[in-house]
């Protein structure tokens, strides 16, 4: 699959389109938007860690979900960043160029906290950015 992202391109907090099939069970599948949450040195491996974005709902129901408003990083409808669906993918699954970036510090913090909660990490250190800086 052709991609327009290259190793070394800043991707953390970018919203990209990814081809997630094949998916099994309750995994998010299809080609959809996703938020890149992994840090830059990891991308040199040709991989990225992403959280899928859905436009099916606009209110978080679970601690692993973060609402993403219309107009944020190219979002055309209200949606949710599904931090409980976090997965590592090959950069070859990225379709086209990034749609935009999640620039809002409050949303970034909410994503960090949702990931920390889902993974059972110490949320105060993650939430204030002490472990990994932008």
Q: What is the predicted role of each segment?
A:
Residues 1-134:
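Conserved functional hotspots at enzyme active or ligand-binding sites that engage polyanionic ligands
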């Amino acid at each position: 699959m052709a991609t327009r992202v290259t190793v070394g391109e800043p991707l953390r907090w970018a919203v990209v389109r990814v081809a997630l099939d094949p998916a099994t069970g309750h995994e998010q599948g299809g080609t959809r938007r996703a938020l890149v949450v992994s840090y830059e040195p990891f991308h040199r491996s040709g991989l990225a860690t992403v959280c899928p974005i859905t436009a099916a709902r606009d209110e978080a129901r679970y601690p692993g979900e973060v609402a993403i408003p219309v107009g944020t990083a190219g979002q055309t409808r209200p949606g949710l960043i599904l931090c409980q669906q976090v997965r590592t993918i090959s950069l070859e699954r990225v379709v086209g160029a990034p749609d935009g970036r999640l620039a809002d510090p409050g949303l970034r913090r909410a994503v960090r906290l949702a990931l920390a909660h889902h993974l059972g990490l110490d949320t105060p250190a993650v939430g204030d950015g002490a472990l990994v800086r932008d």
